[in-house]
Structure formats: structure tokens, C-alpha cells
Amino acid sequence: MLTQSSFWRSLYRLIHIYAGIFIAPFILFAAITGLLYAITPQFEQAIYKDVLYVEPLNQTPHKLSQQIEAAKQVMPKSAQVIEVRPAPSSDQTTRVIFSDSIHDFTSEAVFIDPFTLKVQGHLAVYGTSGVLPFRTTLDQLHSNLLLGKWGRFYSELAASWLAILTLTGLYNWWKRRQNLKIRQTQKNKLLRWHSTLGLTLFPLLLLIAITGLTWSEWAGDNIRVARQWLNWQTPTLAISLQTDNLPTVMHHEHHEMPHSENLNLNIVSTEYDTALSIARAHGIDAAQIQIKPPTSGNQAWTIAEIQRKWPTQADSIAIDMEQHKVIDQLAFKDYSLVAKLTRWGVDAHIGVLFGWINQLVLALYAFALCIMII
């Protein structure tokens, strides 16, 4: 007769075994595509080198408004600027991003040499992170198998069961650790290797599973509801110029870029110069920033820092351009601990938080996970 202890031991063992048989292939595919995604920044910079980089000149760059006008020359008159990312350094281009009413979640970015106003090229960019086509393909392969919404079942399944496999694996190791040391069979040797890798990767396995679930289709929605209920959500700028402030929606990597519903606001390019000047005067000092014009007449301009590499710079500001007045400002240092951990967790998951070291750790993790599964 099974005791309560042996019942639970058998149950967790069976869960681990059968999940390994039926779910591990999905986790293996996620690990392989995650490994490829982790090393894409270097490939992306090489593939799009002529678009992303310029020869720095010993002169002052042209005004941002002039760069925007240069970008408009190669786009249809109906195209509307929805975002501008000034060149973060003297050897990089400025991105002027236009709406794309045809393709969901993508926009068209025109890359401008800030010194010569030459158009270096234009590419489709995806999501609020502005990911370029090569990485977009790998991103979607990793997150939805290139199958759209229904493909997200796979990644949610992989992330959910990765956490379960990790915890049941730890439990099984704890209960069998003495037997593995005493009985020197070939099977036990393999189990020891499997257990050693699992224990070594344990913190990363949970981190990847949890951060992966935060932007999943169904669990992600529940996590956002729970964070809101616990008052752990990421703070949002008040961008409404009326008393009933309407918040912006702050997305992370992998999320969609919503298209504006009303872009006919007669915005002139020189307003970008003014917005940039006001933002710099109010402490928005990161090299990587994005400037977004309002999408309706009762909304403010928003300027946000988008430096995801440590130390994170994610301050943001909302400006009433009619009065040249700041109506709201958020500083990353004032975020709650949970909001900061969410930001850092997501950035670590996609390999940008600690640069090449982050990428190397993720690549080694993905490789070791593949070995564990195989």
C-alpha cells in the first residue's frame, strides 16, 4: 500500500517523465530558437551595417526636423510619422518611423545620415522595440512558430511546463540523491549528469520560464491582472491634455505596436526640435530615446529613454506643445521594485541587459538545456 509520501514521490516522478516525453520537444524548439535569437544582435548589425551606420564627420549634425523632412521625401504623402529615434551616436543613423496601415504590428523606418541627410535605406520594423526584419523572423519563430496568435499556444505551453519540469526535477533529485551516489549504473550516471545540469541551471530555468510567461497570450494577461490588483504595475505617463488623464500603454519587447487611429494633426517637423529641447532640459539625457507625437488633439507628446542595457535608462516625459509645458514625468529610479524587476527580467530574457555577457549566458543556457532534453 502506498504511503502518502510515496504517492507524491511517484506522482511528481510521473509528471516529470511524461512531461519530458510530450512537452520537451516544444521546449527543445524554444531553446534552439532562443539560442539563435540570443546571438542575432551581432548578425543584425552586420547584415544592416550600411543602413545602421554612417561615417562620422567633423561637423554638427543637421537639426532633427531637417532629418525628418529628408525621410518624408522618400515616403508617400499619405505616410505619417509616428515616432523618431535620433541617432544615439555620431556613427549611427536617425530612424524616422512611419505608420503602416497594411501590415499588422509593423511600421516602416527610414534611416537618415544626420550629417549629410542622405537616406541610408528603409526597412520594416516590428513592435515598440523597433526590431529589424532578420531578428523579427527569429523572434516570431521563437514565440509563435510563424503561425500568429494560434502559434502562441506553443510558447505558452513551453514556458509553463518548463517551470513545472524544473520544480518536479528538483523534487525528484532531492528524493533520489542518495541512490544516485550509491548505485553506479549507466542509467544513474546519465541521471547524475541530467541532475547536475538541472541544478546548475535551476535559477535560470525559473527566470526564463517566469519572464517568458509575462508576455504570453493567456498567462500573461492573468499576470498583468494580478500585478494591477497588487498595485505592482509599471507606472504610465498621463498624456491627456484634459482632466480625465488617459494613460499611455507601455509595452516590452515582443509586444505589438498599435497603429494610430487619428494621425491627421498637421504636425510640423520643427515641433520635434522643440520637443527634444524641452526633454533634454528636463533630464531626458540618454543617448537612445524615442519621440512620439500625439495621436489625437487632446494628447501630449511623449519622449522616452529606451536604453535597455545596464544601467537601464527608462525615464519618460509628456509635453503639452501648445504651451511648451511638461505635464507629467516618470523616472525609472522611482519605479517600484516589482516594476524594476519586470523590466530587468524581460531585458535579461532577450539578452540585452548586460550586453554580450548576457548573450553568452543565454547561449550557454540554451545549449545546456538542449543537452538535458536530448
For the regions a protein language model found, what residue spans apply to each?
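Conserved histidines in hydrophobic membrane contexts and catalytic metal-binding motifs
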Residues: 1-374
